[in-house]
């Protein structure tokens, strides 16, 4: 069973992605959801998700900041950003922390 953490402040986006993942891989996934970056870090500390899929623009702690905190705890988890942001500074920071 793979533990997946979805972090996005838009509930409809989280629900749509969770639904697609469960439809395709439901028998091998356990999905948790966070509504902001701070909550994502807290859930990660509790559940140690192997795959984290998150938005960049979120309240309290943005996705890149949350990913940096998670990466400092776990060098091996997979971090993927799903975002409409096109600002290169976010992409550079994502590359530094080995996120996709």
Name what the model sees in each region.
Residues 25-31:
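A generic structural motif
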Residues 2, 29, 77:
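Switch/coupling loops of ABC transporter nucleotide-binding domains
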């Amino acid at each position: 069973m793979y533990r997946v953490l979805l972090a996005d402040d838009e509930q409809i986006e989280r629900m749509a992605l969770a639904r697609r993942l469960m439809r395709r891989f439901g028998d091998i996934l356990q999905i948790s959801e966070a509504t902001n970056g701070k909550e994502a870090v807290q859930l990660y500390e509790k559940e140690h998700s192997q795959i984290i899929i998150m938005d960049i623009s979120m309240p309290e702690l943005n996705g890149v900041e949350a990913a940096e905190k998670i990466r400092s705890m776990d060098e091996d988890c997979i971090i993927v950003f799903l975002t409409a942001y096109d600002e290169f500074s976010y992409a550079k920071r994502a590359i530094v922390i080995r996120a996709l």
